[in-house]
Amino acid sequence: MNYDELLAPAAKAMRPSGIRKFFDLAADMPHCISLGVGEPDFKTPWSVRDAGIRSLELGRTKYTANAGLKDLRKEICTYLQRRFELHYQEENVLVTVGGSEAIDLAIRALVQPGDEVIIPEPCFVCYEPITQLTGGVPVHIATRAEDQFRLTADQLRAAITPKTKLLIFPYPNNPTGAVMSAAEVEEIAAVLRETNVLVLSDEIYSELTYGLDRHVSIASLPGMAERTIVVNGFSKSYAMTGWRLGYAVGPAPLIKVMTKIHQSCIMSAPTTSQYAAITALHQCDDQIEMMRDEYNRRRRYVVKALNEMGLTCFEPRGAFYVFPSIQISGLTSSEFCEQLLREKEVAIIPGSAFGASGEGYARISYAYSVDHLQTAMKRIREFLKEHGWIQK
C-alpha cells in the first residue's frame, strides 16, 4: 500500500521536533552532559507519591468524571484564587493529561479553518502544529532580545486582523525565561479589550518566577476572564512530569466543549495522578519554594558563566531556561549545537527549534545539579576557546 497517499496532508506536513533530534543524538553518547531537557531534576515530593500509593492501596483505580475528580477541581479553584487571584468554580475546570492536552483541546475547540492564531516567538514547539492541524493559520510575532523577549502591545496591535481568533500568551516563557510585568500584561489586555480575540494563556511555569517578578495571570485583569482559557499543570512546579496531569480553566461554555473532545479521545486523566495532585495542592508550598530557591541559585550561576565567556545572555526571570546568543560563532544555532555535541558532548537546544526568531540563540536548561552545570559550562568555554571565538 502507498501509505504516503493515505496519510492526511496536514499530518504529513508536521515537522519533527527540533528538540527530540538532540535528545536522540545525545542518547548514544555515554559521557554526554545534557542541558536540553525541560524537566525538573527533583523527585516528586514524598507526600504526593504517598498519596498516589494510598489511592492504589484503597482500590481507587476506576475512571473518574470526564472533567476530573470533583475534589481536585475544587482544590484547583482554591489554589488559583490563593496564588493568582483567579476566581473560578468547578464547572470552569477541566483536568487533562498534562498541560499539552489542555492546549490541544483549547485550540481544537476554538479554531476553524482560516482563523488566525497569534503566536509570540520564540515559543514552545506545540502551538504551531496543533493550530495547523485544525486548519488555522499561525501568525508569528518575533519578540526581541532588546525587549527581553516580551510581547509588546504595539506588536500585538499590528498583528491583529479581522481573521484573528486567538492569542497564545506563553509567559513565563519557554525557551527564553521571559516574564511579563503586571503593567505589561495590562497593556496587552487593553489591546485585546478592543477586539473579540480570545486568549490561551499558557501558565505552566507560573510558580517559577524569581526576584520581584511574581507571575500575573492575564485572566485576573478586569474583563479578561471571560475571554481567556488558562492552562496550567503539575509537571514543572511540583516535579510531576511523569504523572501527566494538567488542567484548563475558563468560561464554562468553552470548558464544556473542551470536555466533550476530551471525553471522546481520553475519557479522563489518570486517576492515581489526580488523587496525588490533591495532596500537591494542599501540602507542597514549602517544597515549591525550596525548588524555586535552588533554581534561582543555578540561574544566577549559569547567566554569570555564560556572560563571562562571551555568550551574551539577558537575565531570565522565570521558568528554568536561559537563552544566550551564539552569534559570536558565525554559525547557525543548529550548527553550533551539533558541533558542541560532537566535540564536547554537551547537549543544548538550538533556538531555531522554537521558531525562526530563535535563530542565533540556544536554549539551556538549568534544571540540573550545580555539579552538572559546572561541568557543562567548563566544556562550553573550552569549545569556544578552541574555535577562537573567545580569548579567555
Annotate each predicted stretch with a short phrase:
Residues 1-14, 23-29, 33, 37-55, ...:
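PLP-dependent class I/II
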